[in-house]
Amino acid sequence: MIRTMMNGKIHRARVTESNLNYVGSITIDADILDAVDILPNEKVAIVNNNNGARFETYVIAGERGSGKICLNGAASRLVEVDDVVIIMTYVQLDERELVDHAPKVAVMNEKNEIIQMIHEKEGTIIK
């Protein structure tokens, strides 16, 4: 059996920019991407904590150390600058792979700096 599991998560990032006229996607600081094993062009699910919107797009790597979280194209209509978002990727695993799977979760502060990294096999508790 194949199961779809959360693989990488950026928890409580703040939207720094919104660009309607860009060709689509979300731009994320490359350092943040590396921390949670998200690749450029990878599909991400996004939840806006401020308005409840849920949507999908793909990733563009942003400047390292910038803290940039920029929604581009049509997705920019679903956020405002300073909204708090959760960005997630998923992976499909078989029963054997599930044994060793540990998602990477980066908990962010208001400046989009990583304040906690969580690597847990059994759910995550944010402290």
Curated annotation (Swiss-Prot):
Pfam entry (one) = Asp_decarbox
Cofactor (UniProt): pyruvate
Residues binding substrate: 57, 73-75
Q: In which pathway does it act?
A: Cofactor biosynthesis; (R)-pantothenate biosynthesis; beta-alanine from L-aspartate: step 1/1
Q: Where is the active site?
A: 25 (schiff-base intermediate with substrate), 58 (proton donor)
Annotated GO biological processes are: alanine biosynthetic process; pantothenate biosynthetic process
Single Gene Ontology MF annotation: aspartate 1-decarboxylase activity
Q: Which SUPFAM superfamilies match?
A: ADC-like (SSF50692)
Q: Which domain of life is it from?
A: Bacteria
What Enzyme Commission number(s) appear in the record? 4.1.1.11
Q: What subcellular compartments does it reside in?
A: Cytoplasm
Give the Pyruvic acid (Ser) positions (modified residues).
25
Subunit details for this protein? Heterooctamer of four alpha and four beta subunits.
Q: What does this protein do?
A: Catalyzes the pyruvoyl-dependent decarboxylation of aspartate to produce beta-alanine.
What protein am I looking at?
Aspartate 1-decarboxylase
Native source organism of the sequence:
Staphylococcus haemolyticus (strain JCSC1435)
Q: Which gene encodes it?
A: panD
